[in-house]
Amino acid sequence: MTDEFYHKDIFGAIIDINLGEAEDDESLPLDKKGREFNIFALTDAVGARDKKRAWMLYQGALAAGISAEEVFFKIVWQVKCLLIASKTANVGETDMKPFPYSKAKSFLKNFKSGELEKLSEDLVVGYHLARRGEGEIETLVEKILLSL
């Protein structure tokens, strides 16, 4: 028996030959140094309100092949966690896991009252403008990060 594996169409014709090569599993994107890029370092920088580190990590994410839209939704997730943490007294009142909740609670000291709501509004409005063709997600993410 050979290592060849044939894929046939409904007429019996061979359409693909796999010579025993393992298919690549989906792996995390790599940064310039060949390490796996950690997107949560970027969300931590957003929570810490460190605009320089957040922007640098954003550029690293783009260089690692992560789409701007994926980064955008991670930022939305972080802002949502911060808003939930700001409106609750403990993790029991939420559907969140204890670790992200405690991180969000610790990041709340970096934001004044109303700033999270404004940031959330800017993200939502900017996303819809970009979807209508009135801007780009890449530019929106960059503006949001630099306005922290």
Predicted regions, residues:
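Conserved beta/loop motifs at nucleotide-recognition and modification sites
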Residues: 1-148
